[in-house]
């Protein structure tokens, strides 16, 4: 068997892996795991990834989870162009630094916006208290300012003049609120960086990867399996 990637492009980490593999001509079989139908909890998928998370990579008998680890693996195995994960000690450390920071500072609050503004009301029929949304938006504003001041500064990209894995991961995570028609790219510096990253990836590939996300408001959640809906409703309580 060749390389298999288990993904749902609603997930920002999955989009990062998908875009990287497609951009670099890495051949793979796309194994779709539907998050909205709870397929990541299926017996078949748990055998692939007991953590029940996406994405997962299967390369022969070797199985790997966690998107950052998968991106590093693909970089090394397929000898991706060096700008993605620079060999220079300090530039590579800068990528590593961002990857360590972004999990809680970018990924979590960006996902919260999508859940609070769209998914919770859509599935439960209840609005999240305004103060909860405002608190999350304040956190996002603060963290984006830190991103600009600490990581982007006055550079074209996080590591300098060329796109890296850090830029790719950052942008797909910041796109997550777009599923609820919320735009976080309000500063000119951030908006200009966003466009540079999109163009470096290729606009066609970029928007192909985000098509499922931007169409999420059109999802008919009445088709959701009752058992999965109950599990999601239990999960959503922590956002209320």
From Swiss-Prot:
Record's protein name: Glutathione S-transferase theta-4
Keyword Transferase on entry: yes
Sites where the protein binds glutathione: 40, 53-54, 66-67
Oligomer and partners: Homodimer.
Reactions catalysed, as given in the entry: RX + glutathione = an S-substituted glutathione + a halide anion + H(+)
UniProt entry tagged with the keyword Transferase: yes
Residue ranges of every copy of the GST N-terminal domain listed in the record: 1-82
InterPro entries: Glutathione-S-Trfase_C-like, Glutathione-S-Trfase_C_sf, Glutathione_S-Trfase, Glutathione_S-Trfase_N, GST_C, GST_C_Theta, GST_N_Theta, GST_Theta
Protein family (similarity comment): Belongs to the GST superfamily. Theta family.
Enzyme class: transferase
């Amino acid at each position: 068997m060749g390389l298999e990637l288990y993904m749902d492009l609603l997930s920002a980490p999955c989009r990062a892996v998908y875009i990287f593999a497609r951009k670099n001509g890495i051949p793979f079989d796309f194994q779709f795991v539907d998050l909205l139908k709870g397929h990541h909890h299926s017996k078949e998928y748990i055998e692939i990834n007991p953590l029940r998370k996406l994405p997962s990579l299967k390369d022969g008998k070797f199985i790997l989870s966690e998107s950052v680890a998968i991106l590093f693996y693909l970089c090394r195995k397929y000898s991706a162009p060096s700008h993605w994960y620079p060999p220079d000690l300090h530039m590579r450390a800068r990528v590593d630094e961002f990857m360590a920071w972004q999990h809680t500072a970018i990924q979590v609050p960006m996902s919260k916006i999508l859940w609070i503004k769209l998914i919770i009301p859509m599935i439960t029929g209840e609005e999240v208290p305004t103060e909860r949304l405002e608190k999350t938006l304040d956190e996002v504003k603060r963290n984006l300012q830190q991103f600009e001041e600490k990581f982007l500064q006055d550079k074209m990209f996080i590591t300098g003049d060329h796109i890296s894995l850090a830029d790719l991961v950052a942008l797909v995570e910041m796109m997550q609120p777009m599923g609820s028609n919320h735009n976080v790219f309000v500063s000119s510096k951030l908006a200009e960086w966003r466009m540079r990253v999109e163009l470096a990836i290729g606009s066609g590939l970029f928007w192909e990867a985000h098509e499922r996300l931007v169409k999420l408001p059109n999802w008919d959640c009445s088709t959701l399996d009752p058992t999965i809906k109950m599990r999601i409703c239990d999960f959503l309580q922590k956002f209320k």
